[in-house]
Amino acid sequence: MQINELVTFAADVGRGLLESGAETSRVEDTVERIIRHFYDGKSEVLVVMTGLFVTVGDVTKTVRVRRRTINPVSYTHLFL
């Protein structure tokens, strides 16, 4: 897998997780694991609620996330 493809794939997975309501720490961990599986060099991942930044080698991709959903099943215990 080429570095550009890896960065795009990892960022797309991160976007999907954030849009699905995943915690930022879980998104960051997942994206880092994907990158480490395919690339041994230096990489950086930063995830915030509204986007993520993925750098692998000299390639950086920034993704803004505008749409987020929350799975109501996971929060039902708050209302019981």
Model-derived features: where do they sit?
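Short acidic-glycine loop/turn motifs at beta-strand connectors
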Residues: 56-61
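Divalent-cation
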Residues: 23-47
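Short Lys/Arg-enriched alpha/beta "domain-start" segment
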Residues: 9, 14-22
